Amino acid sequence: MRRRDILRGSGVGLATLGLAQKTTARSECASAGAQTATLVLVHGTWHGGWVWQDVATGLRAMGHRVYTPTCTGCGERVHLTGPDVGLDTHITDIAQVLEFEDLNNVILVGHSFSGITITGVADRCRERIDRIVFFDALVPREGR
């Protein structure tokens, strides 16, 4: 099985992140006007936002707002890679999505290397983040 197929089928994995319980409660209250979750799903190395397509489709069908940006130098934006593109660029990419879309109470999900990216985004945009989720991702340690 290819890596992209594994991640595309990971919608079940996201349910284990606590969204299933929250979704059930929100689905029951949907007719009462309850808000749904806002998620920003950040891809790992060698991928692009497209890797979340099936997961995002499922979450949107449940009424959630889902964003799947592609970081500079990755996926369909690989042509933008260069010596100045790095972690800070990726943090800025995602932070700009939050700012330009005026997103608040965001559940920020990172896969693989983007665990480091979402940590930087959470530090930079802490007032916009509800929580961060490390989905089979690198988790930075204090002092390293």
Model-derived features with residue positions:
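N-terminal export signals
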Residues: 5-26
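Conserved HGGG/HGGXW glycine-rich cap/lid loop of the alpha/beta-hydrolase fold
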Residues: 37-76
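Glycine-rich His-Gly loop
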Residues: 42-45, 112, 137
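Active-site signature of alpha/beta-hydrolase-fold catalytic machinery across serine-
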Residues: 54, 120-124
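Active-site loop/oxyanion-hole signature of alpha/beta-hydrolase fold enzymes
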Residues: 65, 71-107, 123-124
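Residue in the alpha/beta-hydrolase core beta-strand immediately N-terminal to the catalytic nucleophile
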Residues: 107, 131-133
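Gly/Ala-rich beta-loop-alpha elbow adjacent to hydrolase catalytic centers
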Residues: 110, 114, 118
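Flexible "cap/lid" loop of the alpha/beta hydrolase fold
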Residues: 133-144
